[in-house]
């Protein structure tokens, strides 16, 4: 997990879901509403190839099932395919048995389509934490996962008291890497500079300084993005103003913020980072 600044790898992650995948909103889906994720992922793949970056794609099982060409394209481009669950349901709304079923259903789909069994998981809307869903980590381990990236250490979502850097969760002789997304400490608490919100609302220099500081400390910065965040002209759900703000933000193209970061810093997949940490 540690290394010199010149050799530090950071991680770029994509939560592969449609524009209508917003937790708690029903009535939208394939067959009745247009898909935008294929074209947006294609654009991401082209961009990553142009700057020689490898990423982790956390794919919803329902999306992979509906669009069977998506995961093979991601895998063929050399990226890691990981699990985002099946139905985009909050983990807090699932029983342990239902959570296990979602994992297995998604793993079966992704394994067939990518040729590899996923080793990483990210919960929808950061809905997994050590305090509210402690049972989920053991299930992830038992289902063959080596890492989770769900505990966003923010004051308003995720794991509020969680670490800002990767760590191992121990469970009676078992262990699982927890890899939180990047945040920036402030007097107001941790700020969400590592992804969609960060690209929308914080200045590029602030984000760059956070990456630089982490790398100087021997830590990897983890970024996250949704395909809809590079599609400013795409459709949006008719949500309240607050939920519009949270789910979509202003109509901006996050790639305009991300490309300079990819050119300045080194990026790889989370799976590659875990391999590096465990072989160190």
Regions found by a protein language model. Give the residues of each.
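Surface-exposed cleft-lining segments at the edges of enzyme active sites
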Residues: 31, 191-201
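Catalytic alpha-helical scaffold of carbohydrate-active enzymes acting on polysaccharides/glycoconjugates
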Residues: 2-187, 203-280
């Amino acid at each position: 997990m540690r290394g010199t600044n010149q050799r530090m790898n950071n991680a770029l992650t994509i939560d592969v879901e449609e524009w209508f995948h917003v937790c708690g909103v029903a009535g939208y889906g394939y067959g009745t509403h247009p898909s935008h994720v294929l074209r947006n992922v294609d654009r991401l793949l082209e961009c990553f190839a142009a700057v020689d970056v490898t990423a982790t794609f956390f794919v919803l099982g329902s999306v992979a099932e509906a669009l069977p060409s998506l995961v093979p394209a991601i895998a063929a481009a050399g990226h890691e395919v990981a699990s985002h669950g099946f139905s985009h349901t909050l983990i807090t709304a699932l029983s342990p048995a239902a959570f296990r079923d979602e994992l297995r259903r998604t793993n079966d789909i992704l394994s067939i389509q990518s040729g590899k069994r996923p080793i990483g998981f990210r919960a929808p809307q950061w809905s997994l934490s050590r305090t509210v869903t402690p049972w989920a980590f053991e299930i992830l381990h038992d289902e063959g996962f080596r890492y989770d990236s769900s505990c966003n250490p923010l004051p308003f979502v995720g794991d509020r008291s969680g670490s800002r850097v990767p760590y191992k969760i121990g469970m009676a002789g078992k262990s699982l890497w927890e890899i939180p997304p990047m945040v920036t400490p402030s007097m107001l608490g941790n700020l969400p500079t590592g992804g969609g919100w960060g690209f929308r609302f914080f200045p590029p220099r602030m984000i760059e300084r956070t990456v630089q500081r982490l790398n100087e400390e021997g830590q990897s910065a983890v970024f996250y993005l949704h395909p809809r965040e590079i599609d400013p002209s795409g459709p949006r759900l008719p949500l309240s103003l607050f939920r519009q703000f949270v789910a979509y933000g202003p109509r901006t193209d996050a790639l305009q913020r991300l490309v300079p970061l990819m050119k300045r810093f080194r990026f790889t997949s989370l799976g590659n980072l875990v391999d590096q940490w465990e072989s160190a």
